[in-house]
Amino acid sequence: MSEGVDLKELKRRMDGAIAAFKHDIASLRTGRASANVLDPVTVEAYGSRMPLNQVANITVPESRMLSVSVWDKSMVGAVERAIRESNLGLNPIVDGQNLRIPLPELNEERRKSLVKVAHDYAEKSKVAVRHVRRDGMDDLKKAEKDGEIGQDESRAQSERVQKMTDDVISEIDRLLAEKEKEIMQV
C-alpha cells in the first residue's frame, strides 16, 4: 500500500506561502523605520537595474530615520533618484556618499491603503495555500482511484490535509491582524 499523499511535502509548500507572506508584509512601512522599507527599490546601475541593497548598505540609526551608505560615489545620484521615484513617499537628503531618509508620519489615508495592500498579500498567500491543498486532494483521489489506498485511508488523509490548510490559513490571518494593528498604531 502506498501512502497516498506526501503530507511533509504539502506542509513544506504551505510553509513557503507563509514565508512569502511574511516577506511581503515586512516591506510595508509602519511608523517605525525598517531597512525592509527599501526592498522594492531598484537602482539603474552599471547598465542594468539592481536592488538597492546590492549597491548600498542600509541602516536604521533612529526610529524614524534610515541611512543609506552608497558604496560607489558615482552612484549617489542614481540611488537618490530611485528612492524618490519609488512611490514610497520618501525624500532622501544627500550627505556626501550617504543619504539620510527621514520617515514621515503616516496619515490616516496612507495607513488604510497599507492595510488594504496587506489584505491583498494575505489573500494571495491564502490562494497559494488552497492550490497546495487542491494538489494534495487530487493526489489522494488519484491514489484511491488507482487502488493504492483504501477509501478510509483516503478520507483520513484528506481530513489531515484540510486541518493543515486550516492551520496555515489561520496563521496567515493572525500575522495579518498583527501587521494591521502595527500599521494603524499612531
UniProtKB/Swiss-Prot annotation:
The keyword Flavoprotein does not apply. Residues 135-164 are annotated as: Disordered. GO terms for biological process: cytoplasmic translational termination. GO terms for molecular function: ribosomal large subunit binding. It comes from the Bacteria. Coiled coil: none annotated. It is found in: Cytoplasm. One of its GO terms (cellular component) is cytosol. Keywords: Cytoplasm, Protein biosynthesis. The keyword Protein biosynthesis applies. Its main location: cytoplasm. NCBIfam families: frr. PANTHER family: MITOCHONDRIAL RIBOSOME RECYCLING FACTOR PSEUDO 1, RIBOSOME RECYCLING FACTOR. Responsible for the release of ribosomes from messenger RNA at the termination of protein biosynthesis. May increase the efficiency of translation by recycling ribosomes from one round of translation to another. Belongs to the RRF family. This is Ribosome-recycling factor. The lineage of its organism: Bacteria, Pseudomonadati, Pseudomonadota, Alphaproteobacteria, Hyphomicrobiales. The gene is frr.
